[in-house]
């Protein structure tokens, strides 16, 4: 097969010596005498006269025959050329009673002739092509070139880019220039846009392995190369090609250059005049011919390089005659009898394969199926196999409709079985996986199908199916037009809708207009727009052209559901119930006859506008399959089969009515039952180092290579949109659901926030979460606590090499944190002989009752000291009060003494109380021994505003502050859990020992934070008790950053963008009135172009944005130069 394709490439390489010049000089001259628009038709006599006019000055047999004989030969040549063009399918002729407006009454006409809108190209067997068999190949390329490619490029120049070809999805690569709507790209085309003009169903450039696509691409490439060698086209380095700059100077074909020059220089002048005229007198044709004559004579006298060569040698009378003929053929033929512009029509092409080519394609198809089964010996679903082999396109050329029926013709190779309601293709029982389908078997299969087709006539589609397809296509076009106007908030009238859907007669035909209205009413598309008080309109009684219309209630609800699904606030099940199901129900109710009809999946995708929803065909099929609606899905041909007959007692619900009871929720997905914590536990229970290594490597790959590149925008990415971008489905089994994964590393790698559009609902939905990259400082302890200690168990010895290899430590973390053993030692872990030694974790539960007793005791002592009932002492760190153990015990309330300190010996209770106070609150109660009396031990009670130890300040500012957020209130219990303070995580940590002065796990974190706040002049944190009636325990004290002194990394990032977070009832992002750079704002906010999500709290309409140009120069030209050189800036700020 590769040899045959290489041979085809060599054959299609153009050569000037092999091109059929007779076809160019004769048939193409007659072809380009016709108008370029496929809808425009001119009289046979006018085209013949123009042909003779342009070729009469260049006799074919100069010096042999006289002028009259030459004219007769030219007439015969024109008729022969037109006949040959008709046989090739490039030209079609019709005999009509109505003549175009350019015809003078009383003349006998042989009919009208026009270009064919669809050109058929015959493709023979690629294997039989030989270097000597080049004539047929050249004729095929020339037919494709001058019948489709060049006319379409010419068509774009004449009619602009308002109409684009039916482009198909492309694989990633350069942009398709043919799909652009930039006026500067009107005369540019891309190779793929020309391949899209090859009309067959299912052609897609993403299926580049499909032989049909390769055939089409090879033909287009050969045609473009042929045009490039003949200086008709010019191919650029970016893959686009344009008309050659010297195309209007070509000597052959003459009429091609003349028509190109005419449509550029003369045609627009006549068209503006015709469009302004409303008369139909025959005299007007002569008037516009006179306008064209003057314009042509003016351009001929002016001369210039763009003037075609034939006009340079014409006399004045010949120029006038040429202007008259060209006006009749090329300009006025594009208007109807009422001087209304005909709708533009673009050429297209169909490929017709020979029997040898069909055999080659079918053989390659079966071999592809065989190769796919080798990769998946357990079987392939028929829908997946249909997409793999591109069956819709292959069936159109091979002539078979059902892939299942085609495979059942080869029972020795394939076996189609039903597995749980799905058709699955498996290997046959008589042959092995290595046995390929032979060409003889495929030939017998095709021959049998061909003979059956000869014996019994083909069953054509029923009239009801054809009518249904035409009506639904009209419905989709109408909905797309009305949605576009709805998004632009532009009112639309019924006349405008008719003009868009009926371009040929501009909606003026009452019969077509009534038919259109009937269709749109049956499919529940239109509703009268009564917003302006025009409530008297009854849409059932008919509409006038000036009546305002809008989308119906059903379509309006469907549009809202589509936009909600696109903005990640609706699930797939809600999309089905609110949009898809009502539409299919409406289609089923609009059927004229009982029975079944087929809705192509492509039609449903057009109605859904899946390109805006980022919804793939496979995902849409999964939605339809899971819903189990009143239809049947044909997975081979990607159709939805609807039925109109109802069972006895069944009542069809109207399309726009809501069900009486809400439908049952869909079963929870597998990903919602799998969490990241469950997957960690599963891996650690196996106690296998290889699985642990693979698990950790997968985590790092998902974090750094998969998720972080997509969440770098400061505004974050919604979870649903992130799921579509990274295709998380393949990681669910290993790492759990995406939501649980990003929440597991919240504050280390990611920042997970709740979307403000959730309206403060108590039950949080995972789809309302927004994920962004964590931009705060990451300390060694934070990395250890949130990553290493979670993935690697601390109760067993683990090789350091395993940890370093799993984490890719040398490439990902070593540049910031140094070597791994040093970091582990800094966090209190011991390393020896290449092993991370296990640690015995000491857990000391927090006793709220003891803490409440100590806080009450401290408050009573400080109150007595404030009233000067106790003697104060001063030291280096501040003021304090010295009490003996007995005196300290005396300040304890009596009820507490009886419940907690009920020891019979008073000294023993006092000793226990003092010991607990010193250990639990070491920075408020300290041991003190007098130098004069070493036998007596005192307790030193610290008074407020005493200087705290250095370790307390370092611990709070380095470990506590990075965990805080301005808009999020964090309790001390939550901080304790994150830091692992009470679980002994800081017991062997140097920072913990310096901060606590003893064992950190036995020390109250609340006491440490309170000591820091009361002793610092400007503390970076604030403690807010929630309930004043209770003691300030762990669960009742909130910790927040002091915004006057400290700014969290998240708030700092918002400040850089001129924003702040307000907690006035609901979390809102507000401006700070600080000027920020417009360029930095645009570069960071990647999602600014997206519309606001429904329900998102935004600024009031009264907010005013100020703009200031920050440049040194006063001249606008100099300012623009500074902006280009990045020396100037534009500052924006808001006065809310």
UniProtKB/Swiss-Prot annotation:
Disruption phenotype: RNAi-mediated knockdown at the procyclic stage causes moderate growth defect without affecting the production of guided RNAs (gRNA).
Gene Ontology CC terms, in alphabetical order: mitochondrion; protein-containing complex
Transmembrane segments: none
Keyword entries, A-Z: Mitochondrion, Transit peptide
CDD domains for the chain: MPSS3
Keyword ATP-binding assigned: no
Transit peptide range per the UniProt entry: 1-97
GO biological process terms held by the UniProt record: mitochondrial mRNA modification
Keyword check for Mitochondrion: yes
Subcellular localization: Mitochondrion
Superkingdom, taxonomy of origin: Eukaryota
Protein task: As part of the mitochondrial 3' processome (MPsome), involved in the maturation of guided RNA (gRNA) precursors.
Assembly and interaction partners: Component of the mitochondrial 3' processome (MPsome) complex composed at least of terminal uridylyltransferase KRET1/TUT1, 3'-5' exonuclease DSS1, MPSS1, MPSS2 and MPSS3. Within the complex, interacts with KRET1.
Protein name: Mitochondrial 3' processome subunit 3
């Amino acid at each position: 097969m590769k040899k045959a394709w290489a041979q085809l490439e060599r054959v299609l390489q153009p050569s000037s010596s092999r091109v059929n010049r007779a076809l160019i000089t004769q048939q193409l001259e007659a072809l380009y005498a016709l108008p370029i628009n496929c809808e425009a038709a001119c009289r046979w006599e006018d085209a013949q006269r123009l042909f003779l006019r342009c070729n009469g000055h260049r006799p074919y047999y100069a010096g042999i025959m006289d002028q009259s004989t030459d004219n007769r030969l030219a007439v015969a040549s024109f008729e022969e050329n037109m006949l040959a063009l008709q046989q090739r399918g490039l030209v079609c002729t019709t005999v009509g009673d109505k003549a175009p407006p350019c015809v003078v009454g009383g003349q006998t006409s042989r009919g009208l002739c026009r270009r064919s809108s669809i050109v058929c190209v015959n493709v023979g067997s690629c294997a039989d092509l030989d270097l000597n068999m080049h004539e047929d190949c050249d004729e095929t390329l020339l037919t494709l070139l001058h019948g489709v490619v060049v006319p379409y490029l010419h068509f774009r120049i004449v009619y602009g880019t308002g109409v684009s070809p039916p482009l198909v999805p492309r694989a990633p690569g350069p942009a398709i220039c043919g799909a652009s709507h930039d006026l500067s790209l009107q005369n540019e085309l891309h190779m793929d846009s020309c391949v899209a003009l090859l009309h067959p169903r299912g052609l897609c450039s993403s299926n580049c392995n499909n032989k049909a696509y390769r055939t089409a691409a090879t033909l287009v490439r050969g045609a473009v190369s042929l045009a490039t060698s003949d200086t008709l086209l010019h191919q650029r380095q970016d893959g686009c090609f344009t008309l050659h700059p010297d195309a209007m100077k070509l000597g052959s074909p003459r009429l091609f250059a003349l028509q190109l020059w005419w449509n550029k220089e003369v045609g627009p002048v006549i068209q503006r005049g015709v469009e302004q005229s409303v008369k139909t007198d025959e005299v007007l044709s002569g008037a516009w011919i006179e306008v064209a004559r003057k314009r042509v004579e003016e351009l001929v006298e002016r001369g210039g390089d763009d003037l075609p060569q034939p006009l340079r040698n014409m006399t004045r009378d010949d120029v006038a005659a040429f202007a008259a003929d060209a006006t009749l053929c090329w300009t006025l033929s594009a208007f109807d009898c009422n001087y209304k512009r005909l709708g533009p029509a673009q050429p297209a092409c169909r490929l017709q394969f020979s029997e040898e080519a069909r055999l080659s394609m079918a053989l390659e198809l079966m071999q592809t199926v065989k190769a796919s089964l080798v990769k998946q010996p357990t079987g392939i679903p028929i829908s997946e196999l249909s997409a793999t082999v591109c069956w819709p396109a292959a069936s159109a050329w091979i002539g078979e409709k059902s892939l299942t029926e085609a495979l059942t013709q080869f029972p020795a190779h394939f076996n189609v079985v039903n597995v749980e309601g799905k058709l699955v293709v498996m290997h046959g029982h008589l042959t092995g996986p290595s046995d390929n389908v032979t060409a003889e078997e495929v030939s017998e299969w095709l021959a049998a199908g061909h003979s059956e087709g000869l014996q019994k006539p083909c069953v054509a589609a029923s009239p009801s199916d054809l009518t249904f397809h035409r009506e639904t296509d009209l419905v989709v076009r109408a909905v797309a037009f009305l949605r576009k106007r709805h998004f632009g908030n532009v009112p639309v009238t019924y006349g405008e809708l008719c003009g868009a859907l009926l371009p040929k007669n501009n909606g003026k035909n009452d019969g077509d207009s009534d038919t259109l209205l009937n269709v749109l009413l049956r499919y529940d598309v239109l509703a009268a727009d009564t917003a302006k008080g025009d409530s008297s309109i009854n849409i059932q009684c008919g509409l006038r052209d000036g009546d305002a219309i809008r989308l119906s209630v059903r379509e309006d609800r469907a549009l809202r559901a589509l936009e909600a699904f696109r903005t990640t606030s609706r699930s797939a099940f809600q999309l089905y119930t609110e949009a898809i199901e009502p539409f299919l129900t409406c289609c089923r109710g609009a059927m004229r006859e009982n029975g079944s009809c087929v809705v192509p999946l492509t039609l449903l995708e057009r109605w859904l506008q899946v390109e805006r929803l980022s919804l793939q065909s496979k995902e849409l099929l999964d939605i339809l399959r899971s819903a189990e609606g009143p239809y049947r899905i044909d997975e081979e041909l990607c159709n939805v089969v609807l039925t109109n007959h109802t069972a006895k007692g069944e009542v069809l619900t109207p399309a726009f009515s809501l069900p009486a009871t809400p439908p049952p929720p869909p079963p929870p997905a597998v990903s919602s039952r799998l969490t990241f914590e469950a997957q960690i536990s599963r891996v650690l229970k196996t106690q296998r180092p290889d699985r642990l290594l693979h698990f950790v490597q997968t985590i790092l790959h998902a974090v750094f290579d998969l998720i972080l590149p997509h969440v770098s925008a400061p505004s974050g990415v919604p979870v649903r949109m992130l799921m579509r971008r990274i295709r998380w489905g393949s990681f669910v089994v290993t790492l759990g659901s995406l939501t649980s994964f990003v929440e597991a590393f919240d504050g280390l790698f990611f920042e997970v926030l709740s979307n403000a559009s959730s309206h403060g609902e108590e039950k949080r939905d995972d789809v309302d979460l927004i994920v962004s990259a964590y931009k705060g400082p990451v300390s060694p302890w934070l990395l250890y606590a949130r990553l290493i200690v979670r993935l690697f168990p601390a109760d067993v010895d683990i090789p350091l090499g395993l940890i370093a290899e799993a984490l890719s430590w040398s490439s990902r973390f070593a540049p910031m944190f140094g070597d791994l053993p040093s970091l582990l030692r800094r966090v209190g872990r011991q390393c020896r002989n290449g092993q991370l030694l296990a640690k015995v974790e000491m857990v000391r539960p927090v006793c709220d009752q003891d803490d409440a007793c100590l806080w009450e005791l401290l408050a009573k002592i400080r109150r007595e000291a404030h009233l000067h009932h106790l003697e104060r002492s001063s030291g280096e760190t501040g003021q304090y009060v010295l009490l003996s153990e007995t005196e300290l015990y005396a300040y304890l309330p009596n009820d507490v003494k009886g419940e907690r300190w009920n020891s019979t010996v008073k000294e023993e209770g006092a000793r226990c109380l003092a010991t607990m106070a010193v250990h639990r609150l070491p920075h408020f109660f300290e041991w003190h021994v007098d130098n004069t009396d070493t036998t007596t031990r005192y307790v030193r009670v610290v008074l407020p505003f005493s200087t705290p130890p250095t370790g307390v300040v370092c611990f709070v500012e380095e470990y506590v502050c990075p965990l805080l957020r301005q808009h999020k209130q964090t309790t001390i219990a939550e901080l304790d859990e994150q830091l692992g303070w009470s679980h002994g995580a800081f017991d062997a940590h140097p920072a913990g020992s310096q901060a606590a002065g003893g064992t950190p796990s036995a020390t109250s974190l609340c006491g440490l934070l309170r000591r820091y706040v009361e002793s610092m002049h400007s503390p970076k944190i604030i403690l807010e008790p929630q309930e004043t009636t209770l003691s300030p325990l762990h669960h009742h004290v909130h910790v927040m950053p002091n915004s006057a002194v400290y700014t969290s990394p998240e708030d700092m990032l918002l400040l850089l963008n001129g924003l702040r977070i307000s907690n006035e009832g609901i979390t809102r992002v507000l401006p700070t009135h600080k000027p920020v750079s417009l360029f930095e704002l645009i570069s960071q906010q990647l999602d600014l172009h997206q519309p606001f999500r429904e329900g998102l709290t935004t600024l009031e309409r009264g907010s005013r944005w100020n703009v200031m140009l920050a440049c040194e120069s006063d001249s606008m030209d100099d300012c623009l130069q500074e902006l280009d050189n990045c020396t100037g800036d534009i500052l924006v700020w808001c006065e809310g």
